[in-house]
């Protein structure tokens, strides 16, 4: 008798050898073997046969604040995960949400899980813009000969936290805060964009989500162009900043040295050694600009796509150490945040490349 079967999940341009069998009267009977290949090489040909789903391919139905107990992994961007002493994994993230559901509910929202699959939403860890941000911003602006900024708190960006366990009873979160606007207060036609800051919070027990204590300023964007910031914000190949204080990653080496790895676009990824006890820069930071090269205390270059490119698509560094191989592995997001976005990895025996 004739019969039919459907095979799913097959790869294109891959030969498959197929054979059917039946079992009866205590024995197997096999068919002849035949081959089949799905030969589709052209994207247009694939699209001809594509059938779009009949459902909305998003989580809009549960994205609102009132549905936060259902979120699980909805409304998560740039996650950082740490295993705590209580056996839970704690996750922290960029302030980005469908329909801006997070707005008005704090920053750097947290979740926890026992299995890395099912996540309980815990809420924001930072209730408002830290008190140090505006004074530090205007201290730098004054030194640059600029007017005092009165940027609205609602316009700041809260991006890419990184959380690590330092030891039992001590966890550190490094986070990015992006200042809105342009250095001259204009529209970007005559000056480069404002800066970003990396700050740090500590907690003795991440289960107490409201107990994160802000420890203040860590580092900001650094320039090798002195005070020559009157560069249109569209001149990416001549951008004012050398290093961009976004996307921090924190690592403790086997030798117990502590490092902050950071960077986004601009000239690449840099490493800054930290004070073991405080988690702050090991060297005192001077003004975040110099002529010809960025101030050395703001970090050293450890990864770049092109040493001569001031605006390169790499960001989101994450660094780990593998004791079995003796290598540090640096993961970075590559290319623009759309179709070509991908992750690359490089390795080195040294934390500084």
Predicted regions, residues:
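Short, surface-exposed linear motifs at loops/turns and structural transition points
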Residues: 1-41
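Carbohydrate-active catalytic/glycan-binding domains of CAZyme proteins
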Residues: 39-353
């Amino acid at each position: 008798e004739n019969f039919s079967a459907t095979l799913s999940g097959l790869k294109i341009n891959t030969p498959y050898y197929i054979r059917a069998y039946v079992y009866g009267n205590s024995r197997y009977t096999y068919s002849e073997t035949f081959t089949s290949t799905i030969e589709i090489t052209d994207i247009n040909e694939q699209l001809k046969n594509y059938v779009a789903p009949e459902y909305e391919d998003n989580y809009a139905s549960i994205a609102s604040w009132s549905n936060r107990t259902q979120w699980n992994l909805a409304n998560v961007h740039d996650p950082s995960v740490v295993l705590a002493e209580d056996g839970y994994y704690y996750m922290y993230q960029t302030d980005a949400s469908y329909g801006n559901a997070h707005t008005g509910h704090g920053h750097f929202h947290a979740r926890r899980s026992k299995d890395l699959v099912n996540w309980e939403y815990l809420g924001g860890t930072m209730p408002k813009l830290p008190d140090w941000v505006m004074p530090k911003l205007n201290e730098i602006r004054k030194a640059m000969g600029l007017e005092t900024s009165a940027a609205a708190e609602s316009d700041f960006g809260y991006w890419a936290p990184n959380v690590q366990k330092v030891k039992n009873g001590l966890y550190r979160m490094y986070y990015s805060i992006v200042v809105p606007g342009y250095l001259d207060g204009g529209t970007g036609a005559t000056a480069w964009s404002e800066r970003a800051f990396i700050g740090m919070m500590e907690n003795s027990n991440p289960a107490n989500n409201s107990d994160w204590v802000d420890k203040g300023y860590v580092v900001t964007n650094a320039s090798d162009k002195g005070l020559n910031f009157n560069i249109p914000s569209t001149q990416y190949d001549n951008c004012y900043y050398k290093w961009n204080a976004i996307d921090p990653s924190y690592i403790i080496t086997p030798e117990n040295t502590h490092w902050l790895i950071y960077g986004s676009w601009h000239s690449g990824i840099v490493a800054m050694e930290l004070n073991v006890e405080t988690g702050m820069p090991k060297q005192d930071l001077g003004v975040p600009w110099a002529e010809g090269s960025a101030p050395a205390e703001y970090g050293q270059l450890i990864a770049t796509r092109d040493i001569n490119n001031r605006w390169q698509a790499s960001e989101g560094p994450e660094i780990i150490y593998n004791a079995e191989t003796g290598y540090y592995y640096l993961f970075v997001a590559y290319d623009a945040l759309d179709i070509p976005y991908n992750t690359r990895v490089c390795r080195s025996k040294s934390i500084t490349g």
